[in-house]
C-alpha cells in the first residue's frame, strides 16, 4: 500500500495559507500516513491531526494583535517575540483549547523540525503529545534574533527552518512513497542572502547558527529547485500560493 507523507514549510503568519489547506483536507477527509512540519508548519499542523478545523485561523485572528501574545511587549519582557506563557500555555490550554487526546488518537506520526544550536544541524523529533512536548514545538518556531533558544534536556534548539526549511527529502527517507508539500512561498520566490554584518554579530554567541544563516539562501533555493524536479517527475505534489503573501518574515 502506498504511504503518503505531508510536508509543511514554515513562514510565520504566511502559515495561514497552510491552515486553509489543512482545513480543506479535513473537509474532504484527506488523510496522511506521516507528517513533518517546520516552525509555523509544525505549530499549525498539529491541529490537522487533532481534527480541529478552523482553530488556527480563529485563535490567530483573535490574539495576534494582543500585545501580550506577540510583538515587542513579550520580546522586551521575556526575550521572545511570541510569549511563552500566553501563546504556548494560556491559549492552547484555556483560551482556545487544543484537543491533545484527539491528536494522540490519530496515531499518525508527526515530526517537528528543530535546529540544534551547538551543531547547527536539523533534528526531527516525533511529537507523541502536544502538551507534553510543547517545548519542542516552541523550539521549532523560535526564530533567531527575536527568540531565546529552547532547552530540551541538555540541548538547546532554535527554529527548524534555519537548517531544513522544506524537509521533503527527509520524509521520503521515512519510507513515504508519495509526498504532498505545502509551501508558503509562490513559484517564483527565491531567498536572498541575509545581512552578513547582522549574522556575524549573532554568531558571536551562536556560531553554528550563524554559519547556517549565511548559507540559508543557497540551501533553500537548492531545495526549491530539487522539489520542482520531484514535482515534475510525479514524486511530489506541491501546494503553493499563486502569488506572493506579503508578510514580514525574519528568516
Language-model segments: which ranges?
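Patatin-like phospholipase
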Residues: 1-38, 46-251
Amino acid at each position: 500500500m502506498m504511504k503518503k507523507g505531508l510536508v509543511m514549510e514554515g513562514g510565520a503568519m504566511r502559515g495561514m495559507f497552510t491552515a486553509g489547506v489543512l482545513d480543506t483536507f479535513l473537509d474532504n477527509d484527506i488523510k496522511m500516513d506521516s507528517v513533518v512540519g517546520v516552525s509555523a508548519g509544525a505549530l499549525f499542523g498539529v491541529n490537522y491531526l487533532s481534527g480541529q478545523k478552523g482553530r488556527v485561523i480563529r485563535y490567530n485572528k483573535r490574539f495576534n494583535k494582543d500585545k501580550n501574545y506577540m510583538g515587542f511587549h513579550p520580546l522586551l519582557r521575556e526575550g521572545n517575540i511570541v510569549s511563552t506563557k500566553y501563546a504556548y500555555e494560556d491559549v492552547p490550554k484555556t483560551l482556545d483549547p487544543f484537543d491533545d487526546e484527539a491528536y494522540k488518537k490519530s496515531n499518525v506520526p508527526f515530526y517537528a523540525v528543530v535546529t540544534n544550536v551547538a551543531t547547527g544541524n536539523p533534528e526531527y523529533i516525533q511529537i507523541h503529545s502536544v502538551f507534553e512536548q510543547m517545548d519542542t514545538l516552541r523550539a521549532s518556531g523560535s526564530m533567531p534574533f527575536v527568540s531565546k533558544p529552547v532547552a530540551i534536556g541538555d540541548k538547546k534548539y532554535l527554529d527548524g527552518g534555519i537548517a531544513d526549511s522544506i524537509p521533503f527529502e527527509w520524509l521520503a527517507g521515512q519510507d513515504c512513497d508519495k509526498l504532498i508539500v505545502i509551501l508558503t512561498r509562490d513559484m517564483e520566490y527565491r531567498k536572498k542572502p541575509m545581512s552578513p554584518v547582522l549574522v556575524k554579530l549573532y554568531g558571536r554567541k551562536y556560531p553554528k547558527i550563524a554559519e547556517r544563516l549565511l548559507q540559508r539562501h543557497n540551501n533553500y533555493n537548492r531545495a526549491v529547485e530539487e522539489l520542482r524536479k520531484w514535482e515534475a517527475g510525479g514524486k511530489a505534489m506541491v501546494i503553493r500560493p499563486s502569488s506572493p503573501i506579503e508578510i514580514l518574515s525574519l528568516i
